[in-house]
Every structure is written in structure tokens, then in C-alpha cells.
Amino acid sequence: MNPRPLIGITMGDPVGIGPEIILTALAGTSVYEKCRPLVIGDPGVLGQAMAVAGYAPVIHMTDTPETGVYRPGTISMFSPAPPLSPVTWGEPTPETGGAMEAWITTAVDMAMAGAISAMVTCPINKEALKMAGSAFAGHTEMLAMRTGTNRYAMMLAGNRLRVVLVTIHTALQNVPGLLSVDAIADTILLTVESLKQRFGMNAPRVAVAGLNPHAGEGGLFGDEEARLITPAIEAARRKTEAAITGPWPPDTVFVKAAAGDFDAVVCMYHDQGLIPFKLLHFEDGVNTTLGLPIIRTSVDHGTAYDIAGTGRADCRSLTAAIDMAIDQAACLGKRPAA
């Protein structure tokens, strides 16, 4: 058995920075020393990005992950969609949107079949998905549907802060109506389970943020803390011995978490968690989907059309996502036999 896990890396939006950061992340030897990276995407687009990235490896096309060539200076690729190149950086089309979805579903199917240990995704463009007629708003929903998963959550993780979201992509005005005792408690428990199983923590410490200023200030600024969040915390505590505390005032809980007091913070809505997270981990943060039967990590940034094709893209988030996928594969014992 090859000791290095096989990691499928989807190219993401082919007219964004995905192709460039793949090239720069795979330049050198460090990634190859830890895993076998298989790029799922368009070889012509990757070739087009070589002039931008300043790195021109050999592209090895493979029909299966097992027959790839995994050594520095060579990038093994699998291409399940019609050729795209040449593309125009920063200009999505229905064809680029369709290719993105094909690459993602292929990686999911490979992971579900055990052909790869984990999948790592580069950023996609939701507008291009819509142009292609996709029914999905983004990665998380697509992965959940493809794997038949109803219970899932988004975690953003770095070495100083981890946040998990109860609600994800929805208008702020809709958040209070989407919160429930069951939804909050389930997110808390999923966070605890994932910290144990995928991050190797025996006794995780989870903080739960309030929704309102000062966590409601005893009902002066809202009743969601008393009506929903506190009962959810109590319900979660009945099902686990992990340390679950809260509801914490949102303006202070992240300070304590960044200081090492908590292993993760459960947040009520998207920007509550992502603003503090990106202040600390804008360059090296990782998005990982909890609850899936497969391992999926991702960069925590977008397609960056404004710098696509300029050679200025930073690959640190992708490198961190690859490292996290490797670590999760080790924790879960997911490794192809090849």
C-alpha cells in the first residue's frame, strides 16, 4: 500500500485563479512528499496558466487515479468535461460553469468509491453555475445532494480559530426565522463529532455565539438566546460530555477563541463567523464540510477575477486545504489501496 494518501484537487473556476494556485501549490516537492495529488480539470487551461504561474510541469493524463504519476515536475490530471481552452481570464461562460460542476461531481464520485482519500476544491463562480443551468448555489449544497447527506455544516478552520455556521448563504433578515433549537443543537453536536473524528480531539471545547448584541442582554436586545440558543446548548449537553458553553456575546467570544480558550465557535450566521475568521486567516484559512461521508476541504477565498491571469494569486489557502485533507484522511483512516 502506498503510504501517501491520494488527494483529488478540482480546478474550480477555470477563468479564475484556480489553475494558477494549483500550479504554484504543486511546484516544488513538499506536497508530493505528503500525498499523491490528482488534478481534476482541463489540461489546456492548466497549460494556459503556466505562463502566468511561471511553472511548466509535465501534464500526465490518466484514466484512473491509480495510474497517475505522482512526482515533482509532473502533474497527473483527469478530465471528465469537454475541452475549454483557450479561456479568457475573468470571463465566465456556460461552458466554464458546466465544466466546474462536472469536475466537482467526478471528484465526489471518486471519493465515494474510495478511489481517492479526499477531495480539495478550488473556488467556483456561482453565476457561471447558474449560466450552465445548474440547480446548485455552491459546493456545499452540491456535495450534500451528491452524497445523499441531510446533516452537514460549513467549518472555516485555521490554526487560531475555527468557526461553524448554523445558517449559511441566506439574507441576514431571514436568519432569525431559520434558527431553531434542533438546528442549533444539531450543529453543535456535529461540530463536537467532527472535532473528535476528523481533528483528533478527545475533549473538544465548543463555544456557542449569541445572535444579538451582548447575547441579548437578558432579553433587552432580543429573545433568541433565551428562546432558542440556550435550550439548544442544554439539549446538546445531554448527548455529549464535551465542554459546550454559551451563548457568548458575539463581540467577545472570538477574542477568547483566538487566545486558545475554545476549539471551535458555533455561529448563527455567515458573516458573524467569517468576518473574525478572515481577519485572522485571510491568506491561509480552509473551508471544510462537516457531516459528509467523504473528506472535502477547500480554499476559503473566491475566484479573484480581478487578479486572474496576472501571476499575483496566493496559493497558501490551497496548500493549507491540502494539508488539512491529508490530516483528516489520517484521522479517519481513508487511504486507497493503490
Swiss-Prot record:
Keywords tagged on the record: Cobalt, Cytoplasm, Magnesium, Metal-binding, NAD, NADP, Oxidoreductase, Pyridoxine biosynthesis, Zinc
Binding site for a divalent metal cation: H169, H214, H270
Keyword Cell membrane set for record: no
Catalytically driven reaction(s): 4-(phosphooxy)-L-threonine + NAD(+) = 3-amino-2-oxopropyl phosphate + CO2 + NADH
Described purpose of this protein according to its UniProt entry: Catalyzes the NAD(P)-dependent oxidation of 4-(phosphooxy)-L-threonine (HTP) into 2-amino-3-oxo-4-(phosphooxy)butyric acid which spontaneously decarboxylates to form 3-amino-2-oxopropyl phosphate (AHAP).
Pathway: Cofactor biosynthesis; pyridoxine 5'-phosphate biosynthesis; pyridoxine 5'-phosphate from D-erythrose 4-phosphate: step 4/5
Localization in the cell: Cytoplasm
More details: The active site is located at the dimer interface.
UniProt-recorded Gene Ontology molecular function terms: 4-hydroxythreonine-4-phosphate dehydrogenase activity; metal ion binding; NAD binding
Pfam families per UniProt: PdxA
Family, as annotated: Belongs to the PdxA family.
Organism: Desulfosudis oleivorans (strain DSM 6200 / JCM 39069 / Hxd3) (Desulfococcus oleovorans)
Name the record gives this protein: 4-hydroxythreonine-4-phosphate dehydrogenase
